[in-house]
Amino acid sequence: MDYRVLLYYKYVTIDDPETFAAEHLKFCKEHHLKGRILVSTEGINGTLSGTKEDTDKYIEHMHADNRFADLTFKIDEAESHAFKKMHVRPRREIVALDLEEDINPREITGKYYSPKEFKAALEDENTVILDARNDYEYDLGHFRGAIRPDITRFRDLPEWVRNNKEQLDGKNIVTYCTGGIRCEKFSGWLVKEGFENVGQLHGGIATYGKDPETKGQYWDGKMYVFDERISVDVNQIDKTVIGKEHFDGTPCERYINCANPECNKQILVSEENEEKYLGACSYDCAKHERNRYVARHHISNEEWQRRLNNFKDVPEHTHA
């Protein structure tokens, strides 16, 4: 494979995020990189793709800056670019938790668990494993026995915790996310909220899956990623499929966005059912006048109506 995908973050002071972002974007474009990077006064959060040569130059460029000299990159091999464009954007936060009183992970955060320590925590009955990601990420893949917060945005996680404290009180809490950045801030919030014995998987799922000792054990399904790949493997020992097809409940790991642009919900759908149900998550979305699947495939009004009739045979929840 000639391409690589880099995933990284660091909480570090960046005095002028706007200027940094503009200069960084220029460097990335000059080296044919594509991806998404967020920059704020609290640090940097990025994922990008490029050839081995170009990503090596990027890593070298970052390590030459004293602020990022110890920056750790998680690296995946890839067959092509994982992004269509290159964006470097200044933001208020590099991961949006939107707290009234912001958390600085450099001052307060949960204990770091190595992959080996995290595996032991998974085997400990007195430890609660809390997924810090969104529900659609969990539904594609998660650690065995982990709690699934019913959220679609990271910023909703604190409210979920407050409403479900009984699941966490009196337990050791270890949280995890894709690459570790969300847990840095979220675990610090848990500590500030008064929870004791709070930990986090250092380096996230991405690091755990590549660890030569743990080999991704106890992970079921695939890991959702925010790029063109959609998902990647984690468990090197006993792979399983846990995702369930939106319409018929069969094993599925194929995510699409609902064809209704006003919905855009991510659903697990087979190619057959995407065609059958017009790329939509529900009857109402399938009949939406701006259905993108209908437009993309130049479906006639007669054929559109014929496929809408397919919804008569599916569970009631898809008619909402």
UniProtKB/Swiss-Prot annotation:
Does the record bear tRNA processing in its keywords? yes
Q: Where is the active site?
A: C177 (cysteine persulfide intermediate)
Known EC number: 1.14.-.-
Provide the alphabetized UniProt keywords.
Oxidoreductase, tRNA processing
Kindly indicate whether the keyword tRNA processing belongs to this entry.
yes
Reactions listed under catalytic activity: uridine(34) in tRNA + AH2 + O2 = 5-hydroxyuridine(34) in tRNA + A + H2O
InterPro entries in the record, alphabetically?
A: Rhodanese-like_dom, Rhodanese-like_dom_sf, Rhodanese_C, TrhO, TRHO_N
Q: What's a BP term from Gene Ontology annotated to this protein?
A: tRNA modification
Q: Which Gene3D superfamilies match?
A: 3.30.70.100, Rhodanese-like domain (3.40.250.10)
List residues traversing the bilayer.
Answer: none
Domain named Rhodanese is located at: 123-217
Q: Which GO terms describe its molecular function?
A: oxidoreductase activity, acting on paired donors, with incorporation or reduction of molecular oxygen
What family name appears in the similarity comment? Answer: Belongs to the TrhO family.
Its annotated function is as follows: Catalyzes oxygen-dependent 5-hydroxyuridine (ho5U) modification at position 34 in tRNAs.
Q: What is this protein called?
A: tRNA uridine(34) hydroxylase
Designated gene of the protein: trhO
